[in-house]
């Protein structure tokens, strides 16, 4: 009996012992390595739907003009605007680079908080490492939407879980109440639905652990009813769709089982004093934020519309579909039935039910590990979210003999996760990971507790412990953490294969070379040919890169479904006042929306369709100008077959010319051109230089119109302004330029001077 007692008593709460120096070193080195890998992931992608640009331009407009909700459109609360305005006042530029660095800091902080949470419960280095790596992997979606309020949301939720667990385990309910009040206020003022979900979680924990026996007796019944009604009320506008009905059922079943499990051994911990502390802190935080936006022109009516009424209309305006696993309703009902049966057996003194729950916890975490191991080929969040709901009650269930304060602290994390699982409605995108990431530390804590509990419950014959098995288990967990970390570094390798975007505020963002060329080309042509820029759907990074204004300050990605008719009419009037206005359309994104029943429509969409036509098309992007206007695009070449005319040099026959209006960085001398097939920049390129190509240059203006005579020119060539560059060569026996090909202009040393594309 003495030997198995040497297992860590993870259910005991005691002061955290200082880690050995090597443990701290290993954890710190691992965290640093994962953060570096995450940094490369963060700067190694740019998403076509460009929520990043929408958020950034809204932040800039608020900082420069004020009028949040009145003039500056946003779907989110005022806190992110006040937060970024404060940082901007301290010197932070509102750029893609700065926003990505802040999102990276939030990403890493969430991983550290979750690892700290697991460490506080288990005192295990390998568990901390596994949770650290798992959360980095699970929240990789943060790299898809830098600067988005989702980064702030997961940071606040992680802090509520981590600090709340520590304080509740240490029986410090006042700090928990203060932190909960502040955190919930921030969430309410960032994304109101997420704040409401966190508030409901805190209320549930408060009622279940109230010192008043009468409150505690009625709390489970009240919460069970609430757990069924809340999803029905939230999802009422879309309950006619099958995926939403399944969602409401799965959540209601999970809420019934989780609240029921939490009520089995809830201690008497809080009363009105903690409630007053929480409300006072929340009120103080809200007052600071409200004062800041009211001082910048927002009225109470604007705030009511933007913070509450507008979000209530969003499920009807824009929603996506989550594909549940087959048989999910049956799984949810079976899980609830299993809980009811387990509770019935527990009340009758059946000790074996705890063994079953502990064993099921271990099975669940094995399934979780397998889901995580699918990264990066398969995003783990989609599968984890679905099964987190029916499994949640297992990790809240109090095992016999557990310390009360540890159980209460774990219950707090479980209830917080339960509430956040509603975040996925009505748009199951990145919200899936944001709403379910707490499943990782909770599963780690619950599985550790189950392992130790089972080891104590079933000591080895003769007093022998489970030391060897424990070492094997630790090794397996360490290998799991290592594999996840390695896979994150493999994903980070894409940064090495990309090309710097090189656009203002996004200089070090890297994407594939042909995509870089497309984004640069569209931005350059917007500067050259426009004085105002709009896009369909909203891609406002182009405005940030080009410096061109949007028609109004009401900017959002899906403006066709979220902006009111009056706001769309204001944009039409602004475009009418600018004959040189340009519009960029992304046909692939429009097709994606149309296939999901979200096709753009409304007065502004009809106006754009009638009055703007494509000047050129590239990679499903259409660069549109006003009807009847003609422009010559910059850095978009065409390859032409020459008529049978004699070459100036009979020894060098010519049958092809590549011609484009070119604008180069000052001082750069072009020694060669490389033309590679689209999507295959590393393949065999067509190389044109002084050895086999003749050069002619015609001075031009930004509109592509000649302003001087055409003259032959020697390689290398420099340009002092726009020019029409014509390169003559013989294509026989050489790679043929293909439509949409990437063109790289290089100097003598092989350095990249500029990128261009061949017409499609």
What are the language-model segments listed below?
Residues 43-58, 68-86, 93-97, 298-300, ...:
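Extracytoplasmic catalytic/substrate-binding loops of multi-pass membrane glycan-assembly enzymes
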Residues 75, 491-561, 571-576, 580-594, ...:
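Short periplasmic/luminal acceptor-recognition loop of GT-C membrane glycosyltransferases, typified by
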Residues 101-123, 159:
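Transmembrane-helix motifs of polytopic, lipid-linked glycan transferases
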Residues 114-138, 154-155, 171-178, 305:
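Transmembrane-helix signature of polytopic, membrane-embedded enzymes
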Residues 143-153:
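Short acidic/glycine- and proline-prone juxtamembrane loop motifs at membrane-interface regions
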Residues 157-179, 187, 205-220, 233-234, ...:
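Membrane-interface transmembrane helices that cradle and orient dolichyl/undecaprenyl
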Residues 175-192, 198-206, 224-240, 283-290, ...:
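Membrane-interface alpha helices of multi-pass inner-membrane proteins
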Residues 196-197, 380-398, 407, 411-413, ...:
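Hydrophobic/aromatic-rich transmembrane helices and adjacent perimembrane loops
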């Amino acid at each position: 009996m003495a030997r198995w007692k040497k297992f860590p008593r993870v259910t005991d709460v005691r002061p955290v012992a200082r880690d050995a120096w090597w443990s701290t070193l290993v954890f710190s080195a691992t965290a640093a390595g994962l953060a570096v890998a995450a940094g490369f992931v963060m700067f190694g992608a740019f998403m076509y739907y460009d929520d990043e640009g929408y958020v950034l331009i809204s932040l800039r407009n608020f900082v420069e003009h004020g009028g949040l909700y009145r003039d500056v459109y946003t779907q989110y609360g005022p806190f992110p605007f006040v937060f970024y305005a404060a940082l901007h006042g301290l010197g932070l530029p509102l750029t893609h680079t700065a926003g990505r660095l802040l999102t990276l800091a939030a990403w890493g902080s969430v991983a550290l908080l979750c690892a700290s949470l697991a460490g506080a419960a288990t005192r295990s280095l390998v568990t901390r490492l596994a949770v650290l790596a798992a959360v980095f992997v699970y929240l990789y979606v943060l790299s898809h939407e830098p600067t988005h309020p989702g980064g702030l949301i997961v940071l606040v939720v992680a802090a509520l879980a981590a600090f709340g667990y520590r304080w509740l385990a240490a029986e410090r309910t006042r700090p928990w109440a203060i932190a909960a009040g502040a955190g919930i206020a921030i969430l309410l003022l960032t994304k109101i639905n997420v704040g409401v979900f966190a508030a409901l979680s805190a209320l549930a924990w408060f009622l279940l652990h109230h010192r008043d026996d009468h409150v505690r007796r009625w709390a489970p019944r009240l919460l069970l009813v609430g757990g069924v009604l809340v999803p029905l009320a939230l999802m009422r506008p879309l309950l006619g769709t099958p995926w939403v009905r399944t969602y409401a059922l799965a959540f209601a079943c999970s809420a019934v089982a989780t609240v029921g499990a939490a009520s089995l051994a809830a201690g008497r911990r809080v009363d009105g004093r903690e409630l007053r502390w929480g409300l006072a802190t929340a009120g103080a935080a809200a007052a600071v934020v409200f004062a800041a936006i009211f001082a910048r022109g927002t009225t109470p009516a604007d705030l009511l519309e933007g913070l509450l009424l507008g979000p209530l209309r969003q499920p009807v305006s824009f929603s996506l579909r989550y594909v549940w696993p087959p048989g999910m309703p049956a799984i949810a009902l079976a899980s609830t039935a299993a809980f009811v049966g387990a509770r019935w057996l527990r009340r009758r003194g059946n000790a074996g039910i705890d063994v079953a729950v502990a064993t099921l916890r271990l099975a669940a975490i094995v399934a979780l590990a397998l889901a995580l191991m699918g990264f990066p080929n398969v995003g783990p969040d989609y599968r984890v979210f679905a099964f987190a709901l029916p499994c949640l009650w297992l990790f809240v269930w109090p095992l016999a003999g557990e310390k009360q304060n540890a159980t209460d602290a774990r219950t707090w994390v479980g209830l917080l996760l339960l509430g956040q699982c509603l975040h996925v409605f009505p748009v199951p995108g990145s919200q899936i990971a944001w709403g379910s990431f707490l499943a990782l530390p909770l599963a780690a804590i619950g599985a550790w507790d189950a392992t130790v509990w089972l080891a104590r419950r079933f000591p080895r014959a003769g007093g022998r412990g489970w030391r060897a098995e424990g070492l094997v288990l630790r090794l397996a967990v360490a290998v799991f953490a290592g594999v996840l970390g390695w896979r994150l570094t493999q994903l980070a390798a894409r940064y090495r294969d990309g090309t710097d975007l090189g656009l203002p505020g996004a200089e070090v963002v890297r994407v594939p070379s042909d995509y870089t060329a497309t984004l640069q080309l569209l931005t350059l042509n917007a500067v050259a040919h426009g004085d105002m820029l709009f896009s369909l759907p909203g891609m406002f990074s182009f405005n940030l890169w080009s410096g061109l204004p949007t028609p109004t300050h009401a900017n959002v990605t899906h403006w066709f479904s979220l902006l009111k008719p009056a706001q769309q009419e204001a944009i039409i009037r602004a475009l009418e006042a600018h004959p040189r206005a340009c519009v960029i359309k992304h046909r692939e994104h429009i097709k994606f929306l149309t296939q999901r029943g979200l096709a753009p429509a409304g007065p502004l969409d009809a106006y754009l369709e009638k009055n703007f036509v494509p000047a050129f098309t590239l990679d499903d992007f259409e660069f549109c100008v006003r009807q009847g206007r003609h422009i010559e695009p910059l850095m978009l070449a065409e390859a032409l077959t020459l008529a049978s005319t004699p070459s100036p040099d009979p020894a060098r026959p010519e049958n092809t010319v590549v011609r484009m209006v070119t604008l180069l960085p000052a001082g750069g001398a072009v020694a060669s051109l490389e033309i590679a097939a689209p999507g295959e920049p590393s393949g065999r390129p067509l190389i044109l230089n002084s050895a086999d190509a003749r050069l002619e240059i015609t001075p031009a203006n930004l509109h592509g119109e000649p302003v001087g005579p055409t003259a032959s020119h020697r390689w290398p060539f420099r340009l002092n302004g726009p020019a029409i560059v014509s390169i003559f060569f013989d294509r026989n026996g050489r790679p043929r330029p293909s439509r949409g090909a990437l063109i790289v202009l290089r100097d003598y040393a092989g350095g990249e001077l500029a990128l261009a594309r061949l017409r499609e």
